[in-house]
Amino acid sequence: MTKLIKNGTIVTATDIYEADLLIQDGKIAVIGRNLDESGAEVIDATGCYVFPGGIDPHTHLDMPFGGTVTKDDFESGTIAAAFGGTTTIIDFCLTNKGEPLKKAIETWHNKATGKAVIDYGFHLMISEITDDVLEELPKVIEEEGITSFKVFMAYKDVFQADDGTLYRTLVAAKELGALVMVHAENGDVIDYLTKKALEDGHTDPIYHALTRPPELEGEATGRACQLTELAGSQLYVVHVSCAQAVEKIAEARNKGLNVWGETCPQYLVLDQSYLEKPNFEGAKYVWSPPLREKWHQEVLWNALKNGQLQTLGSDQCSFDFKGQKELGRGDFTKIPNGGPIIEDRVSILFSEGVKKGRITLNQFVDIVSTRIAKLFGLFPKKGTIAVGADADLVIFDPTVERVISAETHHMAVDYNPFEGMKVTGEPVSVLCRGEFVVRDKQFVGKPGYGQYVKRAKYGALMADQDVVKMS
């Protein structure tokens, strides 16, 4: 049915204006003032912003890790995302050495099909570069529309790839038009530090942070940037948590390299002291990279403001405190890494960023949606409000105040790392391809409505000035 959103203030990455939006066949059909209401369902957005739907470039739903599986699957995870103002996610498809990439991708399709309530795509993890993998990658891009590959520089003996694998992936990505993503921590040194800590009898959650110091994130980030320069390729550094990594990304961008940086809300508002909470509650805040000392927060905020970091992902990777995080009692290395973040990503950036004057409203939209769409081959179908774009829209009340709590969130976990935090602004209604998923803060979507999205190659949808040194 045709829908007409009236009386809202439309906000994109570049503009703010008052207009009506006419939606037909899942697309934005007309943008204008005082549009004809006949035959349309009218939605009144008085007092609200209308944003492009958020895009979360970093989720781990229904993912095995550390002897267990993340609690949120593609149903609960995408429902929570929708309540938070996200209409598209890109999840990480894990691969196994020696196994065809196609098999891993089929596994991830099976996890999502019939469950997702919003649209989704996949990144592909690269754990080894063999002749078979190199032969399969062009098919992955052409047939599956997967145009981003992730390499882990940490998690020794689990996910970690060596530098040769990273370099060869960068070279292949340049030739194929893909974007390489890295988890940048020095896994070899972390492996040594964690073993030494345990030998010395240090088992508490705080040692997760103390054995993964920011210097090791900075070192790995710099190494990845140098390999990117050598390969003449493109790099996206995920979940940047510290000043040392920001510095290396800024250096690379100032040299004109195609290097991009993502941070996450947890690094903007939480700090290392949370890992010292008594009664093992610090385990709730164990993820990698770890939370840093508080002073890093303003460095990250300034990097978002100045364009040294460009996007905000959630790194959604949720485990229950009881029964899952508790697997690490007596050994911090056994605590499943990750947290439930997907639902609060947009609200935290708006409340702590826009409301507190750290970033502008246009920057906010760019950081949670538009830039991600451009980098990952979704723009202009997604990530903007324009005629012909998917009607992925968030009607957002900027005045509502609420307190984040596990009692009211929609994630399938027994805690929220932002428990008790007051935020201003929240989504009222959320549409994905013109259909309500959330309406008046009530879930009205359907599992299975979400569609798999094939993505364009890196750079195909970006203007030249977007690719290099875009601030």
From Swiss-Prot:
The keyword Membrane does not apply. Completely inhibited by p-chloromercuribenzoate and partially inhibited by metal chelating agents. Keywords: Hydrolase, Metal-binding, Zinc. The modification N6-carboxylysine is found at K150. Catalyzes the stereospecific hydrolysis of the cyclic amide bond of D-hydantoin. Has no activity on dihydropyrimidines. Binds 2 Zn(2+) ions per subunit. Can also use Ni(2+), Co(2+) or Mn(2+). Transmembrane segments: none annotated. Carboxylation allows a single lysine to coordinate two zinc ions. It comes from Geobacillus stearothermophilus. Substrate binds at Y155, S288, N337. Homotetramer. Signal peptide: none annotated. Its EC number is 3.5.2.-. NCBIfam families: D-hydantoinase. It comes from the Bacteria. This is D-hydantoinase. Its cofactor is Zn(2+); Ni(2+); Co(2+); Mn(2+).
